[in-house]
């Protein structure tokens, strides 16, 4: 067998009949499968042991040879080789066909490759192949030319004889008629009898004339057909062909069926044809040129590689190994078999019948019919249903052919090669484990015992609890007491992987150290729920066990949950306190006025109250009941760093641990600060979720991951502890309906009645009435909401939960306690009748049904969205899977300019809202210099929060940063252009699969995006596509719905306003030709933008526009942007447009992820003129190849090729990849494979997918070459310690048959018995 680690590329091509016979171990001659009595394979049948190998290890068919010692002997009685049964998975057979057949992929695919090669229309090809027409295969032009005059003379003679015969017959008939009439006249017959006889005679004469004329026409047709007879000409008329063969058989040869195609190909001169086509392309125009280009692609493919076009017509059909199309006995004695066996059986039956007919010398028509049936049966075997009705099995189910085995989600590629089921795994329901550390999980004892069984058994033997593995296994199965102690020992520090489906991003699988727990549920740390998107309402998770040392190391270092605190999408922590923990911390840091023991100034009779010398003293007061943790106190702190302002005032040299200072705060906040690292400045404020998130962000930016993990763990414990003590509960009595509600409703009811009256009178139309009512009731809802918020007391748990940011928002509270307000119908429009009740008061029946209307749409939407979003992720992964960090720095000077702040009129800077996702975590491409020329941050520096703050302080508004879009690395990207990895906060490692991370980061929030198209301000009209459909539209580079024109040039606008359309003319500044945009629908509205004077208003007549500026509302067409503004601008445009959608949903994704995808969309160039290069005009080429070829040609002094960048959608870009394995496993499998085989494509195995498919280590992460070839050199001491045992190259291990003398045991049956000792 091949070892995948030893080859670097995989080529696919056409197999010739020779190849097929060489692969084969024998010919399958009979359609039989197995003998139903003995259940043994039939000889020469589809399961024959002689051809495919024995069904039992080391045992021949007749049983003469049994045992391993006869290895390799071929039994003289039954002809079966004695070997392992698994060869039945790899040995192929073949069927020798009695007549050639064409391969359906090459004839029926679009475009038809056979048709392009032979220049025949697919319709004509079909007629030839399926015996409906003859085709001329060869014409002896010379012979025909030499003897043409003789043949013409013969033809003239024949024609003359026909004409003479006709004239003679007519003469005779006319005389007979005259005689008849004369006779009748003599008898005195009536005139009508005479007329009848005359008519009869004339009719016969006319028939004679017609018959002769038909004969002459036929001779003419035969003659003209013969004189113009050319190769590849079709003759559909059977009789005409027969005549031609009879008369001029020696001048030409014709045939039908696949044989004729084979003959045409034998005489086909590829080089000459390619030359002609190139000539046509150079001189031709229009359709002719296009057709020639398409044909040249196919012809050139056969010209350049060692493929022969003969491979498209088969003389032999390979039979795949029987284990891959098995036959299994069911318990009823019946057999279940793979569909392929039925399809092969049909081929063999028809082939055998055809052989017999040919031997018998059957008439041609019968033989042809049998050949046609053979062709159809081979077609069904290769691709059932591609042509005509599919062959069906029992129950009218179409049989699965070889192509169907590869296609689709259930096909070989996606089901078995790209994802497999694994052993050492289990799954169970998850429950919360609040006592766990961040890197731990609770594993049920029984599950752990089953997963670690082999480890436990080995350890039991090592510790002499069991004599051998068998008894150890028995101990484990009976769960003896010793087993549990051993299990504890075995699982220590052996991480396990937990996975929750759907795994939408890489944090869906994380490693944990298992802790044994009772029960049968897995315990999960509460802080990792966010990453897994898990909750404890019955979710299940799968556990996997990393076995090898390498796997354990990767799990521990790369996948441990405490090393995966940051989100790979935004670089912000995901392991945040949430829900109860937030409430607890919020409660802890609250400051209550007038609480027990609060700070009070000294009076004449009382000393100062609420002043403590240390947190411990304050804690004692709490224990005594003299103080509550929310009360304001003064306390002296020595172990916590003061806030920055106090530190600069009290400790100008900087604070040192142990320096005392007094804080006016609450004990709760002191306790909170004790959870943070000691040198973190004291935080003296209340802690809602947002504030907690900021602190954890800050920690992640400034402290090592270990500290962050410990801190969030402490926060979790404190959060739960104080949440329990806060007594936050929700009961119906906490839902307080504001008493002002009735009065608010009255005033708005009155307004609504007025609108209704106006409508009744006809003063308003329906749309106006609706929008007026919507406006009134929205205001009413807001009013009620405000009244409700004001009415809730501070200590009410419901607003407390919302204000702390733990869960919910005020809109939901408003539905509970105020009023539900307006709801939408499934179209997304507001229903003008509001829901006036709150849920506490209860809805009326009508309100209930109006409310469920929108809710039901929401659920249907979510279901559709999940599927759509999953498919988007799949396409994104496919297009970006080979983007891997390949080098540290590509050395480019280029970059993109990003804005970090906006300068206001008064000179102040306002930080840009999107710094987090655009500039943050990148590398500077040029020194950031302030107005005085001082370098604030140097080129090559990483922009974290501190660096960005420094830039803002220096008054810098824009910086030039490195970007994936400008990276010059050949395949993949370089680390410097990518910047820091969002998930680790450090510069990205070499080998990181950033393409997949990007795809996951964009795809994962896909389910949160909306499906619907928004109606703008209640105006019916062109909807603006938003949400997920908009993201798909952008990534697929489709022309958007409601496309907006962009200015082709800079210049002044002339705006003409028609009834239904605008007409915009741009007069260019450079005096070029005017650009006119006609028929712009008024429903689209003009675009608002900033003008030179700084005001924002609609585009108007006489305005000045810049090149690329959008003129109307709507979305610009990315292809237009590419044409007008060039590739860099279109990339930035796409990134911004995708970000628009995600930001509108509040999803934070870093630009670099979208850039990775967009870069893949613009990787190709369309060749316009090939110059002196090998490229075909009109073909798509990788930009890198294009530039390399041009450099080479220019260096040799030739003409470089001209090309223009082309924007491809992600589906198209995935299918256009250089790797045929990756493309075939993505979509349109048969089309990709057909194309790859003709072009003899070679897959360089650069991306991840192709390596996963062939089972090689993927070239990313630790599998990248520069890490794989590392050699560990032990130091002298290590060597001395390790090699105290005898070395392996002394006389103990003589290298005889054991391969490399590694001293490893060799399985007995692999040991060559060459030096036999019997």
Swiss-Prot record:
Q: How is the cofactor bound?
A: Binds 1 Mg(2+) ion per subunit.
Q: What GO molecular functions are on record for this protein? A: DNA binding; DNA-directed RNA polymerase activity; magnesium ion binding; zinc ion binding
Q: Which residues bind Zn(2+) 2?
A: 890, 967, 974, 977
* GO biological processes: DNA-templated transcription
Q: Which residues make up the binding site for Mg(2+)? A: 535, 537, 539
Q: What is its EC number?
A: 2.7.7.6
Quaternary organization? The RNAP catalytic core consists of 2 alpha, 1 beta, 1 beta' and 1 omega subunit. When a sigma factor is associated with the core the holoenzyme is formed, which can initiate transcription.
Family in the record: Belongs to the RNA polymerase beta' chain family.
Identification of the protein by name: DNA-directed RNA polymerase subunit beta'
């Amino acid at each position: 067998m091949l070892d995948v680690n030893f080859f670097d590329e995989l080529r696919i091509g056409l197999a010739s009949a020779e190849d097929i016979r060489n692969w084969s171990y024998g010919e399958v001659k009979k359609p039989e499968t197995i003998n139903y009595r003995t259940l043994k394979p039939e000889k020469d049948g589809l399961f024959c042991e002689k051809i495919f190998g024995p069904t039992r290890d080391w045992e021949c068919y007749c049983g003469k040879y049994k045992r391993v010692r006869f290895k390799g002997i071929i039994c003289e009685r039954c002809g079966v080789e004695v070997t392992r049964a698994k060869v039945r998975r790899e040995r192929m057979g073949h069927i020798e066909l009695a007549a050639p057949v064409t391969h359906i992929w090459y004839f029926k695919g679009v475009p038809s490759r056979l048709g392009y090669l032979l220049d025949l229309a697919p319709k004509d090809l079909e007629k030839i192949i399926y015996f409906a027409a003859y085709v001329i295969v060869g014409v002896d032009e010379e012979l025909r030319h030499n003897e043409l005059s003789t043949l013409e003379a013969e033809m003239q003679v024949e024609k003359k004889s026909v004409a003479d015969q006709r004239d003679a017959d007519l003469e005779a008939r006319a005389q007979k008629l005259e005689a008849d009439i004369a006779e009748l006249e003599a008898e005195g017959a009536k005139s009508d009898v005479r007329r009848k006889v005359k008519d009869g005679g004339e009719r016969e004469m006319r028939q004679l004339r017609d018959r002769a004329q038909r004969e002459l026409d036929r001779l003419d047709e035969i003659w003209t057909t013969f004189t113009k007879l050319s190769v590849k000409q079709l003759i559909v008329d059977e009789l005409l062909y027969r005549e031609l063969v009879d008369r001029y058989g020696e001048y030409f040869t014709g045939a039908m069926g696949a044989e004729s195609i084979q003959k045409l190909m034998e005489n086909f001169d590829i080089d000459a044809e390619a030359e002609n086509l190139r000539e046509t392309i150079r001189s031709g125009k229009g359709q002719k040129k296009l057709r020639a280009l398409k044909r040249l692609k196919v012809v050139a493919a056969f010209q350049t590689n060692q493929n022969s076009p003969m491979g498209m017509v088969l003389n032999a059909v390979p039979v795949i190994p029987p284990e891959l199309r098995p036959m299994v006995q069911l318990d009823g004695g019946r057999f279940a078999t793979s569909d392929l066996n039925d399809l092969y059986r049909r081929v063999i039956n028809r082939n055998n019948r055809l052989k017999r007919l040919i031997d018998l010398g059957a008439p041609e028509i019968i033989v042809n019919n049998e050949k046609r049936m053979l062709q159809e049966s081979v077609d069904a075997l290769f691709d059932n249903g591609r042509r005509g009705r599919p062959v069906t099995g029992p129950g009218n189910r179409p049989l699965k052919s070889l192509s169907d085995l590869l296609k689709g989600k259930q096909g070989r590629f996606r089901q078995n090669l790209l994802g497999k089921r694994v052993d050492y795994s289990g799954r169970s329901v998850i429950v919360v484990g609040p006592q766990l550390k961040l890197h731990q999980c609770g594993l049920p004892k029984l599950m752990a015992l089953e997963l670690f069984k082999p480890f436990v058994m080995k350890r039991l033997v090592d510790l002499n609890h069991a004599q051998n593995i068998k008894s150890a296994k028995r101990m484990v199965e009976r769960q003896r007491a010793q087993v549990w102690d051993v299990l504890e020992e075995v699982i220590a520090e052996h991480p396990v992987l937990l996975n929750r489906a759907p795994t939408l991003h890489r944090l869906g699988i994380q490693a944990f150290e298992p802790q044994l727990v009772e029960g049968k549920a897995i315990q999960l740390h509460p802080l990792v729920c966010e990453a897994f998107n898990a909750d404890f309402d019955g979710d299940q998770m799968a556990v996997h066990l990393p076995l090898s040392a390498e796997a354990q190391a990767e799990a521990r270092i790369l996948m441990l949950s405490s090393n995966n605190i940051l989100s790979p999408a935004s670089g912000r922590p995901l392991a945040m306190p949430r829900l109860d923990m937030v409430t607890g911390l919020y409660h802890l840091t609250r400051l209550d006025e007038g609480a027990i023991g609060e700070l009070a100034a000294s009076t004449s009779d009382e000393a100062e109250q609420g002043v403590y010398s240390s947190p411990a003293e304050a804690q004692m007061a709490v224990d005594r009941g003299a103080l509550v943790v929310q009360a304001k106190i003064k306390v002296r702190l020595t172990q916590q760093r003061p806030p920055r302002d106090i530190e600069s005032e009290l400790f100008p040299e900087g604070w040192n641990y142990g320096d005392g200072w007094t804080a006016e705060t609450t004990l709760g906040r002191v306790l909170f600060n004790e959870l943070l690292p000691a040198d973190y400045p004291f935080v003296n404020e209340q802690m809602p979720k947002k504030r907690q998130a900021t602190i954890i962000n800050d920690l992640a930016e400034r402290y090592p991951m270990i500290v962050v993990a410990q801190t969030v763990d402490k926060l979790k414990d404190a959060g739960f502890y104080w949440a329990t003590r806060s007594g936050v509960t929700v009961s119906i009595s906490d839902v307080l309906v504001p008493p002002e509600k009735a009065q608010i409703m009255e005033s708005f009811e009155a307004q609504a009645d007025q609108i209704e009256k106006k409508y009744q009178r006809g003063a308003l139309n329906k749309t106006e009435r609706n929008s007026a009512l919507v406006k009134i009731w929205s205001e009413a809802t807001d009013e009620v909401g405000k009244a409700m918020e004001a009415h809730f007391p501070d200590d009410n748990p419901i607003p407390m939960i919302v204000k702390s940011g733990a869960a919910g928002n005020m809109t939901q509270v408003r539905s509970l306690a105020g009023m539900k307000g307006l709801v939408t119908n499934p179209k997304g429009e507001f229903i003008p009748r509001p829901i006036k009740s709150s849920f506490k008061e209860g809805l009326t029946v009508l309100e209930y049904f109006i409310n469920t209307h929108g809710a039901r749409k929401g659920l249907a939407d979510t279901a559709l969205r999940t599927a759509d979003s999953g498919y988007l992720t799949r396409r994104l992964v496919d297009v970006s899977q080979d983007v891997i960090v390949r080098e540290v720095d590509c050395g480019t000077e280029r970059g993109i300019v990003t804005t970090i702040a906006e300068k206001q009129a008064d000179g102040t800077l306002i930080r840009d809202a999107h710094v987090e996702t655009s500039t943050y975590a990148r590398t500077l491409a040029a020194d950031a210099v302030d107005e005085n020329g001082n370098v604030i941050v140097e080129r090559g520096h990483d922009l974290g929060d501190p660096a960005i703050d420094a830039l803002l302080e220096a008054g810098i508004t824009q910086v030039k940063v490195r970007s994936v879009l400008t990276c010059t690395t050949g395949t993949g990207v370089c680390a410097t252009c990518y910047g820091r990895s969002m998930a680790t906060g450090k510069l990205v490692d070499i080998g990181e699969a950033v393409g997949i991370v990007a795809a996951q980061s964009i795809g994962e929030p896909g389910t949160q995006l909306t499906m619907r198209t928004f109606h703008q301000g209640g105006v019916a009209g062109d909807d603006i596509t938003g949400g997920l459909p908009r993201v798909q539209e952008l990534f697929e580079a489709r022309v958007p719905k409601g496309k907006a024109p962009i200015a082709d040039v800079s210049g002044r606008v002339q705006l003409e306003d028609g009834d239904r359309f605008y007409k915009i003319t741009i007069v260019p500044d450079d005096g070029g030709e005017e650009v006119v945009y006609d028929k712009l629908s008024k429903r689209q509205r003009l675009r608002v933008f900033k003008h030179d004077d700084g005001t924002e208003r609609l585009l108007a007549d006489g305005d000045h526009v810049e090149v690329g500026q959008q003129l109307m509302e709507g979305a610009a067409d990315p292809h237009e942007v590419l044409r007008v503004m060039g590739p860099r601008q279109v990339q930035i445009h796409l990134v911004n447009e995708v970000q628009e959608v995600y930001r509108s949903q509040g999803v934070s994704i870093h630009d670099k992820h979208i850039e990775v995808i967009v870069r893949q969309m613009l990787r190709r160039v369309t060749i316009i003129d090939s110059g002196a290069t090998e490229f075909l005009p009109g073909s798509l080429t990788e930009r890198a190849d294009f530039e390399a070829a041009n450099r080479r040609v220019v260096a040799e002094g030739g003409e470089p090729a001209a090309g223009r960048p082309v924007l491809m959608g992600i589906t198209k870009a995935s299918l256009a990849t250089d790797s045929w394995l990756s493309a075939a496993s993505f979509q349109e499998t048969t089309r990709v494979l057909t194309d790859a085989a003709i072009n003899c494509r070679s897959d360089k195995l650069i991306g991840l997918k192709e390596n996963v498919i062939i089972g090689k280590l993927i070239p990313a992460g630790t599998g990248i070459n520069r890490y794989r070839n590392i050699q560990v050199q032990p130091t002298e001491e290590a060597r001395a310690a390790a090699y105290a045992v005898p070395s392996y190259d002394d006389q103990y291990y003589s290298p005889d048959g054991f391969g490399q003398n590694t001293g490893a045991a060799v399985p007995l049956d692999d040991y060559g018995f060459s030096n036999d000792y019997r």
